[in-house]
Amino acid sequence: MTRITRHLIFIGILALLFAAGIWQDGTVAQDTKIPALSELNEDEKITEKASLGARTWIIPTPVWVIGSYDKEGKPNVMTSSWVGICCSKPASLMTCLREATYTHGNIMERKAFTVNIASESYAPYAAYVGRVSGRDVNKFETTGLTPVKSALVDAPYIKEFPLVIECKLTQTVELGLHTMFIGEIMDIKADRSILSEEGAPDIEKLKPFVFTPGSSKFYGMGKLVGNVSDLAKEAEKK
């Protein structure tokens, strides 16, 4: 069998897989049927976990609104949920953005960004700024939110959002479709109304919300589960 023949056979197999909806970009096809719980027998309900494929379904994810300036100095914000703390010394966080986003170019240009965390009452604003591009609209003008120029980094933050993290870009990591931006935390600013007696942000006062990939919904934080050290002791007894 010649190399060309083998190549044609391989292409034919791939075409059949695509037609059958079995393979898409190395993952299970989006419309692959996941058995309903009612379709499983009692043993399967206990032992079986459904295979969901290689997806970005980490449940839940934070809702961060990233602030930046474009090269003309226009303030912009966008919502990102692919985010997190990545180092304690120096205190640093990261967010991952596609190159196609307006914010990606802004951060590369200005070497800075802010993270703005909203209370539940501002959920509509977080949803909106994550669905339109700063190339097309001035999001501060359309929402009525107020941009504030940071005194520490070359980026704006949102006055109305109660918790703000100001970051200086220190590293970029190309990961494929997304770029990881690592920012050193220069300062955290918080409305005094959300602080505990100890001076730390109080989650019950802040009332943040989270995002659920797959369903594309925001959820509030719910009730207190318990103190971590107390819960750990309970598990040890069991």
What are these regions (language model features)?
Residues 1-11:
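Bacterial N-terminal signal peptides that target proteins for export
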Residues 11-20:
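Bacterial N-terminal signal peptides
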